[in-house]
């Protein structure tokens, strides 16, 4: 038993680290840009500090910047250093991990795009309400913690960002991030494999409360949270629980809570948490009926939360090999890039810290360059720091938009991928190679979602016809999965046949669009 | 009241370690059997059966009880899904969805009489589409070929 829990914890933490790596990297970049290029005054200006716009502005910036609830920690710490008010920081910290361009696109192709619109408006209500209450109840004037010399133009200005990122890696930020990850271990210990499948069914009054308990320690990237919402709506699970999952699962973790207690003390943190939970649960129960999907057959379960439970059962063996295999299957190229980048940042951070023992790096970075050639200097336009910072932040947003097109390819490309995956699943299912089929089924489910987003991204619409064809395929994939789990060969063959037919129909539905758009 | 980060983090680490240890000692309940999709008994197997059901259920007078009314509402709601499991082209599917939405709106208004009248009025069209699905499914035999190839 303890072996399953141990290796389960190893797998869950490794999965979370790999998923979080690109977002943590982004968080360190944003924090360094805020510190070195923008500076405290411009950061306060960016967030509209002291004006009525500060909370909605924090919400809007949070929607644009691609960070998760772990990656947002360095940014929140930097915002506090810049002297922003608690309400604004917490509003940004809670919203930034909920949405990004990729996840919003994904959400808009769900059966009820209005739901995502309603959820995002409700998230604005949540952050505005608790931000206003927080700043009203605790109006203490926040002092800027440190005064920093600005970095002069030239190579030092670029280098200073890397120095900041490296040093930030070896600061309390990484401790809070590790505390955030401890929530995953905690859930792995208390939730046995697949034990949360039937806990948040639609109509269950306790579902939002139960989900709240799981969502706070859980870690979910914006994409994971959005795909879980999709699965919940597909299965007719509780809408209130889905809302709690989005706000608390994607937006909050143990690391943020601990940082908040350290930064603001127990009293303010408890008040903030109580108001947050009250508003989230209140809205969750309020949304339950109006947003409940009417065009689905409610299932009595959901697989969406299997990722929060222990991945292994007591009787499973060869767990280290299973962990390795799962990681090999799951880790995406962008996650590998994120992890390697973080490793490089960690190494350079160590190097900078070692250099600082013998040499005053900060003084060198902030000392002005000697201008030797006035003539060439006149041709060399020095851009102000805020221009570079704006370019960096807009660049991050632009990269995340470009990533949308890479992550959600054209329908033709998706269909080619699906064709390969379909062959793997159906031939493995029919020939009794269950583990092979079960490995490829989530891949097919993923491409089935991505083709819909890919069409939406390029056509700015997805017809109900295409959406329904994809839904029929998704339903049959799940029925086939259950048949394989039951080891019922007759059912496997039956659903494999139906799935193949549904796939052919879906291909025709999406090929028509491809041809029309080509013409 | 601000806290000393080091002291506070040490306390948090101890709490997390303790709670994790307690969790490890506790019995891990047996993994629950995996859940199933419950398909309602009155859900027709395909679009053709759904149209047959609509004809039967609207041939008599009003539904006798709320359960029958609910079942009728369910069936009209399933029409687009069942039609998507056929080879009907987009235009035909769109029409079925349009009719389904119209029926569901009437069902929401609790006007069973009007709902039945509307279904009866559209029944010929629904039947024609059902016949078309049979023809198309018979014509499109490539699925079977594809299965054999695999």
Segment roles from a protein language model:
Chain A
Residues 1-33, 37, 41, 45, ...:
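Selected transmembrane alpha-helices and immediately adjacent juxtamembrane segments
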Residues 33, 102-106, 182, 186, ...:
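Alpha-helical transmembrane segments of multipass membrane proteins
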Residues 64-120, 192-269, 273:
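Membrane-interfacial helix-loop connectors
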Residues 294-303, 408-425:
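Alpha-helical transmembrane signal-anchor/signal-peptide segments
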Residues 403-413, 429-436, 465-472, 484-491, ...:
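Non-transmembrane, amphipathic alpha-helical segments
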Residues 413, 417-424, 439, 443-450, ...:
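Charged, amphipathic alpha-helical oligomerization/scaffolding segments
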Residues 425-433, 478-519:
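C-terminal amphipathic alpha-helix
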Residues 447-471, 513-517:
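Short, solvent-exposed, charged loop/turn and helix-capping segments
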């Amino acid at each position: 038993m303890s072996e399953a829990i141990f290796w389960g914890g190893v797998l869950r933490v490794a999965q979370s680290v790999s998923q979080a790596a690109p977002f943590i990297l982004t968080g360190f970049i944003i924090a360094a840009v805020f510190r070195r290029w923008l500076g405290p005054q411009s950061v306060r200006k960016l967030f509209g500090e002291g004006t009525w716009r500060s909370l909605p502005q924090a919400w809007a910036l949070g929607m644009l910047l691609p960070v998760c609830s772990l990656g947002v920690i360095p940014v929140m710490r930097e915002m506090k250093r810049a002297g922003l008010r608690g309400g604004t920081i917490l509003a940004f910290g809670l919203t930034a991990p909920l949405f990004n361009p990729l996840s919003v696109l994904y959400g808009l192709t769900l059966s009820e795009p209005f739901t995502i619109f309603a959820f995002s408006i409700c998230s604005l209500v949540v952050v505005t309400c608790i931000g206003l209450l927080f700043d009203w109840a605790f109006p203490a004037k926040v002092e800027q913690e440190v005064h920093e010399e600005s970095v002069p133009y030239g190579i030092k200005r670029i280098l200073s960002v890397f120095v900041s990122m490296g040093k930030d890696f070896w600061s309390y930020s990484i401790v809070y991030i590790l505390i955030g990850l401890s929530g995953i271990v905690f859930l792995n210990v208390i939730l046995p494999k697949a034990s949360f499948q039937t806990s948040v069914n639609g109509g269950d009054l306790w579902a939002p409360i139960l989900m709240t308990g799981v969502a706070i320690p859980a870690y979910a990237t914006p994409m994971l949270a959005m795909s879980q919402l999709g699965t919940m709506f597909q299965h007719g699970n509780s809408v209130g629980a889905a809302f709690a999952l989005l706000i608390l699962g994607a937006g909050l973790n143990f690391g943020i809570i601990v940082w908040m207690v350290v930064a603001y003390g127990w009293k303010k943190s408890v008040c903030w948490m109580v108001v947050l939970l009250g508003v989230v649960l209140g809205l969750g129960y309020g949304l339950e009926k109006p947003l409940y999907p009417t065009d689905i057959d409610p299932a009595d379960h959901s697989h969406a939360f299997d990722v929060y439970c222990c991945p292994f059962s007591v009787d499973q063996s060869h767990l280290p090999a299973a962990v390795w295999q799962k990681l090999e299957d799951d880790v995406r190229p962008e996650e590998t890039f994120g992890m390697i980048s973080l490793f490089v940042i960690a190494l350079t951070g160590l190097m900078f810290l070692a250099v600082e023992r013998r040499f005053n790096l900060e003084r060198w970075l902030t000392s002005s360059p000697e201008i030797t050639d006035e003539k060439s200097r006149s041709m060399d336009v020095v851009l102000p720091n805020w221009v570079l910072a704006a370019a960096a932040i807009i660049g991050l947003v632009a990269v995340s938009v470009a990533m949308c097109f890479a992550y959600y390819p054209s329908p033709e490309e998706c269909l080619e991928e699906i064709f390969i995956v379909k062959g793997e699943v159906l031939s493995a299912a029919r020939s009794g190679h269950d583990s092979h089929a079960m490995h490829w089924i989530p891949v097919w489910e993923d491409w089935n979602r991505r083709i819909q987003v890919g069409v939406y991204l390029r056509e700015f619409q997805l017809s109900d016809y295409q959406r329904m064809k994809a839904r029929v395929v998704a339903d049959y994939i799940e029925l086939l999965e259950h048949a394989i789990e039951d080891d019922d060969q007759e059912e496997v063959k039956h659903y494999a046949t139906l799935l193949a037919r549904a796939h052919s129909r879906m291909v025709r539905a999406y090929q028509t669009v491809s041809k029309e758009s080509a013409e | 009241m601000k806290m000393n980060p080091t002291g506070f983090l040490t306390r948090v680490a101890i709490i997390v370690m303790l709670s994790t240890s307690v969790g490890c000692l506790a019995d891990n309940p047996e993994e629950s059997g995996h859940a199933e999709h419950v398909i309602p008994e009155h859900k027709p197997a395909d679009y053709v059966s759904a149209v047959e059901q609509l004809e039967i259920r609207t041939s008599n007078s009003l539904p006798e009880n709320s359960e029958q009314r609910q079942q009728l509402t369910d069936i009209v709601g399933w029409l687009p899904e069942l039609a998507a499991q056929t080879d009907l082209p987009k235009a035909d599917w769109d029409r079925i969805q349009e009719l389904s939405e119209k029926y569901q709106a009437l069902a929401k208004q609790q006007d069973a009489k009007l709902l039945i009248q509307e279904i009866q009025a559209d029944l010929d069209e629904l039947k024609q589409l059902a016949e078309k699905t049979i023809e198309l499914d018979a014509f499109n035999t490539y699925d079977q070929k594809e299965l054999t190839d695999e």
